[in-house]
Amino acid sequence: MPKRVQVVLNEDILSLGKDGDLVDVAPGYARNFLLPFGKAVPVTPAVMKQVEHRRAKEVERQAALKQEALNFKTALDTIGRFTVKKQVGEDNVLFGTVTNGDVAEAIEESTKKEIDRRDILVPEIHRTGKYTVTVKLHSEVTAEINLEVVSY
């Protein structure tokens, strides 16, 4: 009996690897858990071809996502400034603070494209004025946008 067997994962497994990874596991782990539950398949030349094909498709998909992010960054740079209106008290101090949700709404109003608020890094904003906000569009693409906070 071999000490380790090679399998290709069909899904992400936290302690083992990601979908499509070639991993060495104990034969009992493969035989009793991974293979019966469809979480992995034994390594064969046909399976390896499928894995390579899947990886090539994933590389193409990531390249397309990166290009889309670069195009969106250009659109954000073209617009230039985004405005958020907040209620203001004395000395231009805001009631509350400007959140990444507020910035996401301002971007969506201007670009008509949805953006996840969790990808927006907003500094502490408690007064009206002009600020710089970082937007993560892709793992390799970030944009710096100008945000103006005004009273209404």
From Swiss-Prot:
<dbReference type="InterPro" id="IPR020070">
    <property type="entry name" value="Ribosomal_bL9_N"/>
</dbReference>
<keyword id="KW-0694">RNA-binding</keyword>
<dbReference type="InterPro" id="IPR009027">
    <property type="entry name" value="Ribosomal_bL9/RNase_H1_N"/>
</dbReference>
<comment type="similarity">
    <text>Belongs to the bacterial ribosomal protein bL9 family.</text>
</comment>
<dbReference type="GO" id="GO:0003735">
    <property type="term" value="F:structural constituent of ribosome"/>
</dbReference>
<dbReference type="GO" id="GO:0006412">
    <property type="term" value="P:translation"/>
</dbReference>
<protein>
    <recommendedName>
        <fullName>Large ribosomal subunit protein bL9</fullName>
    </recommendedName>
</protein>
<dbReference type="Pfam" id="PF03948">
    <property type="entry name" value="Ribosomal_L9_C"/>
</dbReference>
<dbReference type="GO" id="GO:0019843">
    <property type="term" value="F:rRNA binding"/>
</dbReference>
<dbReference type="InterPro" id="IPR020069">
    <property type="entry name" value="Ribosomal_bL9_C"/>
</dbReference>
<comment type="function">
    <text>Binds to the 23S rRNA.</text>
</comment>
<dbReference type="Pfam" id="PF01281">
    <property type="entry name" value="Ribosomal_L9_N"/>
</dbReference>
<dbReference type="InterPro" id="IPR036935">
    <property type="entry name" value="Ribosomal_bL9_N_sf"/>
</dbReference>
<keyword id="KW-0689">Ribosomal protein</keyword>
<dbReference type="InterPro" id="IPR020594">
    <property type="entry name" value="Ribosomal_bL9_bac/chp"/>
</dbReference>
<dbReference type="InterPro" id="IPR000244">
    <property type="entry name" value="Ribosomal_bL9"/>
</dbReference>
<dbReference type="GO" id="GO:1990904">
    <property type="term" value="C:ribonucleoprotein complex"/>
</dbReference>
<dbReference type="GO" id="GO:0005840">
    <property type="term" value="C:ribosome"/>
</dbReference>
<keyword id="KW-0699">rRNA-binding</keyword>
<dbReference type="InterPro" id="IPR036791">
    <property type="entry name" value="Ribosomal_bL9_C_sf"/>
</dbReference>
<keyword id="KW-0687">Ribonucleoprotein</keyword>
